């Protein structure tokens, strides 16, 4: 039984989340999306990322009853895709003629972050992030960003204007 439990735990992607206990979720009905902070991406790449992930975020927010308001939103939603090189590995590859040469591998590490900020107080009310590399390796979908966004929003269980978390908002 323990082995089965460990197997299922290792198959689900790890989502790290924060929720502000003092936030008044009953007052949140509208939102506005700020474009991804993308210092590391070119303008073309940034637009492509935004265009791919934004519809999934809009779906999740509208499923919770939130409406878009560009003038006076209750919350500001910001998302970011973070990546960089990690763990350079040196390997000495030999051949039959005893000539050795170094081989350096740089793995690309990435994460997706979504956060909601109260537009009046400017305080963070919710934040969720996921290791995109591990999640994307395990997925067979056409666009794995959808599943990533769903995993992130499975930690935000608030309908618009309702301070009580609703477990039925989780998607499996």
Q: Each predicted region: which residue ranges?
A:
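Sec/Tat-exported extracytoplasmic proteins
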Residues: 57-65, 81, 85, 120, ...
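Surface-exposed short loop/turn segments
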Residues: 64, 75-125, 131-134
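Glycine/charge-rich catalytic "coupling/switch" loops of P-loop NTPases
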Residues: 69
């Amino acid at each position: 039984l323990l082995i089965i439990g460990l197997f299922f735990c290792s198959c689900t992607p790890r989502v790290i989340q924060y929720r502000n206990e003092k936030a008044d979720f009953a007052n949140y009905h509208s939102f506005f999306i700020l474009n991804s902070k993308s210092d590391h991406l070119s303008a073309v790449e940034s637009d492509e990322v935004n265009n791919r992930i934004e519809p999934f975020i809009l779906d999740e927010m509208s499923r919770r009853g939130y409406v878009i308001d560009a003038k006076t939103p209750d919350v500001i939603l910001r998302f970011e895709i973070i990546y960089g090189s990690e763990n350079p590995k040196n390997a000495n590859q030999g051949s039959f003629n005893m000539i050795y040469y170094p081989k350096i591998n740089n793995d690309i590490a990435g994460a997706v972050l979504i956060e909601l900020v109260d537009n009046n107080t400017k305080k963070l009310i919710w934040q969720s992030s996921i290791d995109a590399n591990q999640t994307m390796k395990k997925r067979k979908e056409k666009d794995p960003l959808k599943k990533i966004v769903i995993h992130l929003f499975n930690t935000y269980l608030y309908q618009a204007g309702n301070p009580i978390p609703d477990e039925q908002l989780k998607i499996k």
